[in-house]
Amino acid sequence: MEGITSFENLPEELKREILLRMSPNSLVTCSRVSKKLASMIRTKSFKELYLSRSMRCPRVLFAANGTITPHVLFTSFQEKEKPLLSSGEQRIITSLQGEFLFSPPVRGLICLVERESARIVICNPGTTKFLALPIVEADETTRIITHLGYDEQKDVFKVLCTRTKPETPHLVLTVGSGKEPWREIVCKFPHTVIGAGVFYRGTLYYLAAFHSKSIIMTFDVRSETFMPITSPDGVDLNQGSWRLVNYSQQGGFALVNESRGFIYQSNGGDAYLETWVWNVDTRKWSMNSILIRKWKDYAQDNEDYDYRFRGTQGTYELVFAPIRVKEDGSLTVILYNTDTQAFRRSKVQMMGEGHEFRFVDTFLDHVDSTLLI
């Protein structure tokens, strides 16, 4: 038919621009049907440009294990701009079978550990592609915890692997083809990891146990060295259920006590969010108490679906998300703008009914990536 031009015949720059607007899953399809497109998508320049554009509009990522059928589900949405081809809500069911623990995503990738077999994989949630890592030996009484980081200077991802037995050495793997070995590294501060942490400016931060005391440990991904951080004055990390979250408003991360709810109800439906914020530049803690007007009125289902503070999205918005989905398989995220004192809701369908996906992890600043395509 006259007037119709095939995609293959379009100018290279136009094809490149169209591909840059596609979702990661759509790029996978393109790479399957066309060797020329696959070659373009896998170039370093395209990967860097695609990631750079995605970083301008980060996503909120939800990860869940199926409670009826054993598979991993990812859902993400983008709030900043109206959807292009790569924006909007993305729902992905992976082929990964089993019950997994999730570590926070870094530059479009996420690390998962299967509870029973201790299988470790690196996954791109947008493409469902994953890379299996070598098995780490551990007995039935030992839990494996992983953290994903990125060395910007060498342009490589690294996985820090720790086991809950203090006498076992810490391991590091530089991500490549999947055949790279785990390497034992020396730690001058023997500790066990308590839970997931955050990755910020080349450093992993996580809660750990050191001589029967809870501390905050750091791991420099480039130098592969550990260093503890002193907890805030008057804060006992052994008391309560503390969690680290990204907090970009003050150039670092925040420490919150989830066992106290950290939402303090006051008369009239207002509430206070209290956090300890670590500034990575000044290396100092500061107490942050934010008044949230009419929280009780806005979060009408707060009692049934307990909202937790998950960090900041952009400069001014605080993000609150429930730890489990509703019976219809959906969840509602609340965003509060500290500058305008305005609320927004975003309802996300997790593709499950009843209790199929009961608990969910929420991660901020996830980005689309072409890695593992």
Curated annotation (Swiss-Prot):
Organism classification: Eukaryota, Viridiplantae, Streptophyta, Embryophyta, Tracheophyta
Residues covered by the F-box domain: 4-49
NCBIfam families listed in its UniProt record: F_box_assoc_1
Name used for this protein in its record: Putative F-box protein At1g76830
InterPro entries to which the protein is assigned, alphabetical: F-box-assoc_dom_typ3 (IPR013187), F-box-assoc_interact_dom (IPR017451), F-box-like_dom_sf (IPR036047), F-box_dom (IPR001810)
Disulfide pairings: none
Top-rank lineage group of the source organism: Eukaryota
Coiled-coil intervals, chain numbering: none
One family name in Pfam for this protein: F-box
